[in-house]
From Swiss-Prot:
Its cofactor is glutathione. Glutathione binds at residues 17-22, 46, 60, 79-80, 123, 127-129. One of its GO terms (cellular component) is mitochondrion. Its EC number is 5.2.1.2. This is Maleylacetoacetate isomerase. Residues 104-226 form the GST C-terminal domain. It is found in: Cytoplasm. It is an enzyme of class 5 (isomerase). The gene is maiA. Pathway: Amino-acid degradation; L-phenylalanine degradation; acetoacetate and fumarate from L-phenylalanine: step 5/6. Disulfide bonds: none annotated.
Length: 230
């Protein structure tokens, strides 16, 4: 793989998007410099030609890797979990891999399972696009989100209580943690009592101290409105 200096990394992102936050944290954790392209979901910019030209799903994030010398075609990844795995595989010499060593398939599967609870069971059914679609049916959007987050967190807690050290799987930050902490931010906004999930709460508190998490936090982005900034 080319060195980081040979590459131009671009992230299409929204400050409050948990999927975008996963990549912001991962890029910081792995010491990969990137340029942000803000996409305002509340203004519908995800459906703009600018965004759909790179992401036909009309979502964020989108990760684009370009060779500075244009010796190869750009790589465009439109799903956050795929992008996280790509960052692990394509930058093997960078610090802080997101998955355990390939020699430990059991631990790798565990990390992926925890990440998938967040990315597959919780996030898709509580994101803005779904909340907007269920609202006409009289659904209480806040209660909907809270119930589904709590169900997912209960599953995560049941697994992580046995696997956690300082973080979700042992004492090293993994892809599971990169997915968990943005979900915790969303849970707090939804009024979830994290005290019900002591392992998640403890791991989240440890993650909040990490510089990469601070850099990826929704309150610190270039498109974060002034009233929400730290």
């Amino acid at each position: 793989m080319s060195t980081n200096s040979d590459l131009r990394v671009t992230l299409y992102t929204y400050f409050r998007s948990s999927c975008s936050a996963r990549l912001r944290i991962a890029l910081a954790l792995r010491s990969i410099s990137y340029t942000s392209v803000p996409i305002n979901l509340l203004k519908g910019e995800q459906s703009s030609t600018k965004n759909t030209a790179v992401n036909p799903s009309a979502t964020v994030p989108t990760l684009i890797i370009e060779h500075v010398d244009r010796s190869q075609s750009p790589i465009t990844i439109t799903q956050s979990l795929a992008a996280l795995e790509y960052l692990d595989e394509a930058f093997p010499d960078n610090p802080n891999p997101l998955l355990p060593p390939i020699s430990n398939p059991q631990q790798r599967a565990l990390v992926r399972s925890l990440a998938s609870i967040i990315a597959c069971d919780i996030q898709p059914v509580t994101n803005l696009r779904i909340l907007q679609r269920v609202a006409p049916f009289g659904v209480d959007r806040a209660a909907w989100s809270k119930d589904l987050i709590e169900a997912g967190f209960a599953a995560y807690e049941a697994i992580a209580r046995d696997s956690a050290g300082v973080f979700s799987v042992g004492d090293t930050i993994t892809m599971a943690d990169v997915c968990l902490i943005p979900a915790v931010w969303g849970a707090e906004r939804a009024g979830v009592n994290l005290g019900q999930y002591p392992t998640i709460k403890r791991v989240a508190e440890a993650l909040e101290k990490e510089n990469a998490v601070k850099e990826g936090h929704w309150r610190t982005q270039q498109d974060t409105p002034t009233e929400f900034r730290c």
